[in-house]
From Swiss-Prot:
HAMAP family: Phe_tRNA_synth_beta1 (MF_00283). Mg(2+) binds at D382, D388, E391, E392. The keyword Nucleotide-binding applies. The lineage of its organism: Eukaryota, Rhodophyta, Bangiophyceae, Bangiales, Bangiaceae. Residues 626-719 form the FDX-ACB domain. Tetramer of two alpha and two beta subunits. Its main location: plastid. Keywords: Aminoacyl-tRNA synthetase, ATP-binding, Chloroplast, Ligase, Magnesium, Metal-binding, Nucleotide-binding, Plastid, Protein biosynthesis. It catalyses: tRNA(Phe) + L-phenylalanine + ATP = L-phenylalanyl-tRNA(Phe) + AMP + diphosphate + H(+). It comes from the Eukaryota. This is Phenylalanine--tRNA ligase beta subunit, chloroplastic. Binds 2 magnesium ions per tetramer. One of its GO terms (cellular component) is phenylalanine-tRNA ligase complex. GO terms for molecular function: ATP binding; magnesium ion binding; phenylalanine-tRNA ligase activity; RNA binding.
Length: 720
């Protein structure tokens, strides 16, 4: 033989970190299984790539004077059926609309006549299919040239006739075949009783030799035994002690299909993946296993002149067929129109039927719109849903044959009142200069509702408040030497109430943290204070047309411990508690590294929207702007600490001066000189007339009258 490229040779053992297997596919062998004489290797590679396979290389080789092309093909993990030449030939015939060459019927006469034992299910654990035979009078000769060429083209080196036949069958049918030297097992021959079992390792069974390595066994490893001798690690490899050699005369042939999860667990436990284990892990087909076993015996009889003396068979489970109902409309809706001479049309039933039949799917038409699809047993691992059939049609027909334009959908449904309400809140807050923030619904801290099996410890609890995310985001910005952001978040929080999880939509706002607040350009910048932050919140509710009441907060009524008691308030709407507003306390600010005041708000949007079934609009006074200038006067008043500023403003408005345009608070402080329970506030009064310019004398008279009313009627002290 003239081997020109040694890169074809592959290792028999694949390392555990290999997640995929690359099949070396001989084009000449493929042409014998499917009628694709016309197509060339590169065109075939393109078709396979478009159908979801990876063709990593196409290489021309010369094997024994014959030119061949070798394709390195990788399939997805769920396509166990294409890990064989038979399976790949089915795929290629569907993609190229070629016929499959019917494999020659393998004679079964004499192969199964001497069934000596039916093996019980209890003896073979985790095994869905098992058949074996004993053959004697074996004469091991040199492998025929055609067999060596087949193996070499697929990356295998010829070892001896028995092993070559085993590898050839695995490449052709995808079914691993174990063949061992039965004479090397003590107390076994064709006449004596043979016990075949598969079970998990016991503590006494320490190791097995595979590929010149001692493999330590654990209780997770499934093994097969003959008369209590470990013959193989189930689905992975044969015990090297029982390998066949040139002197072998009596052999034991075994074809088995084990549960995928068990083989996968055994493979991970010992750290080895083989050609056999990869196929077992992905799932094998009983029909292919039966054909592979029969052809193995046929080749052994033909090439070694051996005779079958006994066979062993586990009662086979029936290959259940999968029936899937699907409608023509479903296929057309998912795939959309196809490209057909600039006209828009959809796949017809005949086109769909031909495509599915090329995949060996059986079609039964129920009516004009629906039909039933029977899935072949070798495709049960990847086609078991309606959408899988749609994907197969698109894959074989050609993804590029469908129009890629996304269809336009006409939405006739109007947004809900809920959606409009949330959008209105977003627009108002954005217009006020706030940035919308979004955080995960899962948080690190332990709360009422914890996940049983979280992927990450940092995200193991459903959040019960939005404030934690906003505070953490501000702290992260500071750590990155960035400024904090005045932001808001609208999201869902979760709480337990009477052992039921209650979902609530809330709004949270965070303000402050930066030194860039100034009322005039000439003033030095300062951080946001309580009154400015409260003014932003009041402005928000005013624009939202919601009349909110500010009530003194009772800290015992909530579990929030990071807000100052004397700088916080409970917000109510129609006498319903909707949330709170306040400044972070010093302990929290120091823990997170905040150097300036930060203010937070959290309210319940469900209560805010649905508290009153009737819409109560705020009353407005509409009047034209005055074209005359304003004049301001400042006044310091000593009031009780418990008096609320809003209450004072309402009392002052009772004096009914039409020229008094506005009152604002600009300062407050308290000390011992003022007396216990008292504080001094600075108020700025703005006067403006609608029909003339006010003089200083007129303003002074109005201000003096106001001071008299404050002293006499309100019994308050004016500080000079």
């Amino acid at each position: 033989m003239n081997f020109l490229n040694k890169s074809l040779i592959r290792d028999s053992v694949v390392l555990q970190n290999r997640w995929k297997i690359i099949m070396k596919v001989s084009l000449n062998w493929l042409k014998e299984l499917a009628k694709i004489e016309i197509i060339d290797a590169h065109s075939l590679a393109n078709k396979l790539t478009q159908a979801g396979f990876e063709v990593e290389d196409v290489e021309m080789v010369n094997i024994d004077g014959h030119k061949d092309y070798i394709l390195d093909v990788t399939s997805t993990a769920n396509r166990s059926d294409v890990l064989s030449m038979i399976g790949l030939s089915r795929e290629v015939s569907a993609l190229t609309q070629a016929d499959i060459v019917k494999t020659a019927d393998i004679p079964s006469a004499g192969l199964f006549d001497n069934i000596s034992t039916i093996i019980s299910d209890d003896s073979l654990l985790n095994c869905s299919y098992y058949v074996s035979a004993i053959m004697d009078n074996i004469v091991i000769q040199d492998s025929p040239k055609w067999l060596k060429n087949r193996l070499y083209s697929c990356g295998f080196i010829s070892q001896n006739l028995i092993i070559d036949i085993s590898n050839y069958i695995m490449l052709k049918w995808g079914q691993p075949i174990n063949i061992i030297d039965l004479k090397k097992i003590a107390d076994t021959n064709t006449e004596s009783y043979i016990e075949i079992t598969s079970n998990f390792c016991s503590s006494k069974q320490k190791s097995v030799k595979l590929d010149n390595k001692d493999i330590a066994l654990s209780r997770d490893v499934l093994i097969t035994q003959i008369n209590n001798n470990i013959t193989s690690i189930a689905g992975i490899g044969i015990n090297q002690e029982f390998h066949v050699d040139q002197n072998t005369k009596l052999i034991f042939i075994e074809a088995a299909i084990f549960k995928e999860a068990v083989v996968r667990k055994s493979s991970r436990s010992i750290g080895i993946r083989t050609e056999s284990s990869i196929r077992q892990e992905r799932g094998l087909n009983i029909d292919n296993g039966r054909s592979a076993y029969r052809e193995t015996l046929s080749l052994l009889i033909e090439l070694t002149h051996g005779k079958v003396k006994a066979t062993f068979l586990k009662k086979e489970t029936e290959n259940s067929t999968l029936n899937i109902d699907i409608s023509l409309k479903k296929i057309q809706d998912v795939l959309g129109p196809i490209k057909d001479n600039h006209t828009v049309r959809f796949l017809s039933f005949d086109e769909i039927e031909n495509t599915l039949k090329s995949l060996q799917f059986k079609i039964t038409k129920k009516d004009v719109k629906k039909f039933n699809v029977i899935i072949p047993s070798y495709r049960k691992y990847d086609v078991f849903r309606e959408i899988d059939i749609v994907e197969e049609i698109a894959r074989v027909y050609g993804y590029n044959q469908f129009q890629s334009k996304i269809p336009k959908i006409q939405f006739t449904k109007h947004p809900s009142s809920r959606r409009n309400f949330i959008d209105q809140i977003r627009n108002i807050l954005r217009n006020l200069g706030l940035t919308e923030l979004v955080h995960y619904s899962l948080v690190k801290s332990k709360g009422e509702i914890n996940l049983k099996n979280p992927l990450i410890k940092d995200y193991s609890t459903l959040r019960s408040s939005l404030l934690e995310g906003l505070i953490n985001a501000s702290a992260y910005n500071i750590k990155q030497s960035n400024q904090t952001v005045d932001g808001f978040e609208i999201g869902t929080v979760f709480n337990l109430k009477r052992n039921k999880i209650i979902e609530t939509t809330k709004l949270a706002i965070i303000l402050g943290g930066s030194l860039d607040i100034r009322s005039e350009w000439s003033e030095p910048a300062h951080s946001l204070n309580w009154y400015e932050a409260k003014g932003i919140i009041e402005n928000f509710f005013r624009k939202l047309n919601k009349s909110i009441q500010w009530v003194k907060r009772e800290s015992s009524n909530d579990q929030i411990n990071f807000i100052q008691n004397n700088k916080s308030a409970t917000l109510t709407y129609n006498n319903d508690n909707i949330g709170l507003f306040g400044e972070l306390n010093e302990l929290t600010s120091s823990q997170f590294g905040f150097n300036t005041e930060l203010f937070v708000l959290e309210i319940d949007l469900d209560i805010l929207q649905y508290s009153d079934p009737e819409i109560n609009y705020l009353s407005y006074r509409i009047q034209p702007y005055s074209k005359y200038p304003c004049i301001t006067r400042d006044l310091c008043i000593v009031i009780p600490k418990k008096m609320q500023i809003n209450s004072l403003f309402q009392l002052l408005n009772q004096f009914n001066d039409n020229d008094l345009e506005n009152m604002t608070l600009f300062d407050q402080y308290s000390n011992k000189l003022l007396g216990n329970g008292k504080k001094s506030i600075g108020l700025r009064f703005t006067y403006r007339s609608d029909h003339k310019t006010l003089t200083n004398l007129e303003i002074d008279n109005k201000q003096n009258e106001l001071q008299k009313n404050i002293i006499k009627k309100l019994n308050l002290e004016i500080r000079k």
